[in-house]
């Protein structure tokens, strides 16, 4: 039973950690949008895309959750190895939490610059993708772990 609890804790981390990061990152971008709308309301489409970008990290966590939860190992007879693997895969997503928050900050800076009249939407999108890579790596690592249990 303890092994099953460890495994389910890992599953919960796959949702909780990137979900928290995405919520914080999106709110950082959205807060910047509120201020930017006062200066340039015509750029709302750009603001909205940049604000929403941090939400993708939560999707990576959910995808990993779905992959692991579809495995048939979640029974009271789960092995310590499998339980620890699921927990470790969930813990990996602390990377996505941090990446989502930092991506939100990058997007907020881009939003502020667009509001100031600078044409930096494309460049901001490019720079904001860099933290995304680390969430993708976390997802890839979780996927590889899932293939070993």
What are these regions (language model features)?
Residues 1-149:
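Hydrophobic, small-residue-rich transmembrane alpha-helices and their short perimembrane loops
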């Amino acid at each position: 039973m303890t092994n099953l609890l460890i495994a389910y804790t890992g599953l919960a981390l796959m949702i909780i950690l990137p979900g928290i990061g995405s919520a914080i990152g999106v709110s950082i971008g959205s807060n910047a949008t509120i201020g930017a709308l006062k200066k340039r309301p015509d750029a709302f489409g750009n603001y909205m895309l940049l604000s929403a970008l941090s939400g993708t990290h939560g999707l990576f966590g959910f995808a990993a959750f779905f992959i692991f939860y579809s495995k048939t190992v979640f029974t009271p007879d789960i092995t310590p190895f499998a339980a620890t693997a699921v927990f470790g895969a969930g813990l990996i997503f602390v990377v996505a939490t941090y990446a989502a928050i930092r991506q939100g900050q990058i997007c907020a800076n881009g939003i502020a610059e667009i509001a100031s009249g600078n044409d930096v939407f494309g460049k901001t999108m490019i720079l904001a993708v860099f933290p995304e890579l680390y969430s993708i790596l976390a997802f890839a690592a979780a996927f590889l772990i899932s293939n070993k249990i």
